[in-house]
């Protein structure tokens, strides 16, 4: 163990096997908080390697609660967070829209660690049950096209790292792990990352995890598609990885100011998103959500991004998404 720790402190990367061993100790509470703080900080300063990410993922999944295997295609839309953008919860709003479009979505979610409002903080405002049983979540997925898997419920061993993460208040390797340890193991994933340096490594890890089709995005220090700048995309499809850039024109929409999608507290984000998903919100927000849904639709074989964006906007403007949320809150 000391050898592994010394490697980290000297700025050296670990192998997949070494990381797996280390994270098994972390997941079973055998690494104290002081050691854990120094490990996470040292890795963050140096930068996480692909081997470290995949080793940590395998260790976390070993101790996670499983979710039933599905007999149909489904996806997750999730970001690493840690981007300090303080935007409204675009991925969560996009998940609601995607489900209303008829897509099956199993969203892995958590409360905020390094930002003001996490996905679960918003879901609580919408009165959605975060502690639903596997059976209830499965029924919700079957009947309403979407369910939410609350990370602490499925990763009980994260209790050993939660205090350190909250105390550090910086992005760590666990930000990267979040999108990769969905207990349902979705074959389709739209993943936002906080840095372009993570895009290809994230795609490679998803490939090693047997992802069928995944799209990794980053735009101007933001872990989602934005309309104030171009969006970097790395796509995994048919075991091939390609990278390209998208701009608002590719979706058939215009540029907007970055401040147009700023969020705030859970209550503030709830009010904004509720208004938007009732079909009454600002174009900047509804169109930002729509372009993220456009890429989500692409995962399911719908290649025309302009058509996808129009479809998402039509659903948003109809108010049907808010009706979906009400149904979820009453389920």
Swiss-Prot record:
Ligand binding (Mg(2+) 2): 223-224
Cofactor binding note of this UniProt entry: Binds 2 magnesium ions per monomer.
Pathway: Amino-acid biosynthesis; L-tryptophan biosynthesis; L-tryptophan from chorismate: step 2/5
Keywords for this protein: Amino-acid biosynthesis, Aromatic amino acid biosynthesis, Glycosyltransferase, Magnesium, Metal-binding, Transferase, Tryptophan biosynthesis
Amino-acid positions noted as binding anthranilate 2 in the UniProt annotation, renumbered to this chain: 165
Binding site for 5-phospho-alpha-D-ribose 1-diphosphate: 79, 82-83, 87, 89-92, 107-115, 119
GO biological process, one term: L-tryptophan biosynthetic process
This enzyme's EC code(s): 2.4.2.18
Enzyme class: transferase
Binding positions for anthranilate 1 per the UniProt entry: 79, 110
Keyword Aminoacyl-tRNA synthetase: no
Binding positions (Mg(2+) 1): 91, 224
Record flagged with keyword Iron-sulfur: no
Catalyzed reaction equations: N-(5-phospho-beta-D-ribosyl)anthranilate + diphosphate = 5-phospho-alpha-D-ribose 1-diphosphate + anthranilate
InterPro entries to which the protein is assigned, alphabetical: Anthranilate_Pribosyl_Tfrase, Glycosyl_Trfase_fam3, Glycosyl_Trfase_fam3_N_dom, Glycosyl_Trfase_fam3_N_dom_sf, Nuc_phospho_transferase
Cofactor(s) of this protein: Mg(2+)
Function of the protein: Catalyzes the transfer of the phosphoribosyl group of 5-phosphorylribose-1-pyrophosphate (PRPP) to anthranilate to yield N-(5'-phosphoribosyl)-anthranilate (PRA).
Family under the similarity heading: Belongs to the anthranilate phosphoribosyltransferase family.
Complexes and interactors: Homodimer.
HAMAP family listed in its UniProt record: TrpD
This protein's name: Anthranilate phosphoribosyltransferase
The organism of origin for this protein: Buchnera aphidicola subsp. Schlechtendalia chinensis
Lineage: Bacteria, Pseudomonadati, Pseudomonadota, Gammaproteobacteria, Enterobacterales
């Amino acid at each position: 163990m000391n050898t592994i720790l010394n490697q980290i402190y000297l700025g050296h990367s670990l192998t997949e096997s070494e990381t797996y061993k280390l994270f098994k100790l972390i997941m079973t509470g055998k690494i104290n908080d002081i050691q854990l703080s120094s490990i996470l900080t040292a890795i963050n300063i140096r930068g996480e390697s692909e081997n470290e990410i995949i080793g940590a993922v395998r260790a976390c999944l070993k101790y996670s609660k499983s979710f039933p295997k599905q007999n149909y295609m489904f996806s997750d839309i999730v970001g690493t967070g840690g981007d300090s953008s303080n935007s409204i919860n675009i991925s969560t709003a996009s998940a609601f829209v995607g489900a209303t479009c008829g897509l099956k979505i199993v969203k892995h979610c958590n409360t905020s660690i390094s930002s003001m409002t996490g996905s679960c903080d918003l879901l609580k405002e919408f009165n959605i049950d975060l502690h639903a049983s596997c059976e209830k979540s499965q029924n919700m997925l079957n009947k309403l096209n979407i369910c939410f898997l609350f990370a602490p419920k499925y990763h009980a061993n994260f209790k050993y790292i939660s205090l350190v993460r909250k105390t550090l208040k910086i992005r760590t390797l666990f930000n990267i792990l979040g999108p990769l340890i969905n207990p349902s193991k979705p074959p389709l994933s739209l993943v936002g990352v906080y840095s372009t340096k993570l895009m290809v490594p994230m795609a490679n890890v998803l490939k090693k995890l047997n992802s069928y089709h995944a799209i990794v995005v980053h735009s101007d220090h933001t872990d989602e598609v934005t309309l104030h700048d171009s969006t970097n995309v790395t796509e995994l499809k048919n075991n091939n990885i390609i990278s390209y850039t998208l701009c608002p024109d590719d979706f058939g929409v215009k540029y907007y100011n970055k401040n147009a999608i700023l969020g705030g507290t859970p209550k503030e984000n709830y009010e904004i998103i509720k208004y938007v998903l009732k079909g009454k919100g600002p174009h900047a927000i509804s169109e930002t959500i729509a372009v993220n849904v456009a890429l989500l639709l692409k995962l399911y074989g719908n290649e025309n991004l302009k058509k996808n964006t129009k479809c998402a906007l039509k659903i948003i403007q109809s108010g049907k998404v808010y009706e979906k949320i009400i149904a979820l809150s009453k389920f």
